[in-house]
């Protein structure tokens, strides 16, 4: 089997010199992470990469993931025991206020929920639900930057593909992009929703980063072309020392 390297392009690598060097080193697919890319920049980034290399582009969806929104500074410190408002609508966060995406996702939060931000760097314990916001107490102190992955300690409803993902995939299709990745693929139905957009003639990578994804893998496999194991996000639900065993299960499935 020939080894294929998937490389993520970001601010420090999105230039012609770096992309060409990465191409020379054998990169087989360049990933554009939509979680950290503005929709209005997608077309320009694809055009640049296509002008620098013949290696294909892969658009990686935001998917069913909660993230905190913009913070007033590069990072904001939340003091243990401090009261914090979790707003339903998007706001600029500070040491006493924070909001999450997708928009209005906080409406699903309830009293007693724990919301963890940036791999448990900070943990908010929700104490009271109001009409436009929730009150929470900082249970675990720490720094929070903008757009950090977050999770809650119970199942909530999340669309497997966001409106931004849909629009970005459509842009990609018009520009000849043939590789797409679905973050947080939890079921075959999730993958089918992407197939409705990109069709079966294009390549779909399913990212397995949750227990649900592992449990439903046999149903997911017939819908997708490849599997990508996201060990970082998977470690939110699986003890890190057990990740290699889960990887083995996925590989041999």
Stretches found by the model and what they are:
Residues 1-253:
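Non-catalytic helical/linker scaffolds that mediate oligomerization, partner binding
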């Amino acid at each position: 089997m020939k080894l294929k390297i998937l490389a993520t392009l970001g601010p420090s690598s999105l230039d012609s010199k770096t992309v060409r060097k990465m191409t020379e080193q054998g990169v087989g697919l360049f990933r554009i992470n939509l979680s950290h890319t503005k929709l209005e920049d997608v077309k320009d980034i694809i055009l640049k990469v296509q002008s620098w290399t013949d290696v294909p582009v892969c658009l990686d969806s935001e998917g069913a993931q909660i993230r905190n929104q913009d913070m007033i500074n590069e990072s904001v410190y939340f003091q243990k025991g401090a009261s914090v408002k979790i707003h339903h609508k998007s706001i600029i966060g500070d040491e006493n206020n924070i909001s999450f995406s997708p928009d209005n996702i906080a409406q699903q939060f309830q009293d007693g929920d724990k919301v963890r931000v940036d791999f448990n760097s900070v943990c908010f314990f929700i104490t009271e639900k109001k009409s436009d916001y929730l009150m929470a107490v900082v249970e675990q102190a720490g720094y929070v930057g903008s757009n950090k992955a977050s999770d809650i300690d119970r199942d909530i409803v999340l669309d497997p593909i966001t409106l931004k993902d849909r629009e970005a995939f459509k842009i990609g299709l018009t520009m000849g992009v043939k590789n797409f990745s679905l973050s947080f693929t939890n079921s075959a139905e999730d993958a089918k929703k992407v197939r409705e957009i990109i069709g079966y003639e294009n390549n779909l990578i399913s990212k397995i980063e949750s227990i649900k994804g592992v449990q439903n893998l046999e149903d997911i496999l017939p819908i997708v072309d490849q599997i990508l194991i996201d060990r970082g996000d998977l470690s939110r639900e699986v003890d890190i020392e057990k990740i290699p065993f889960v990887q083995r299960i996925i590989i041999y499935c």
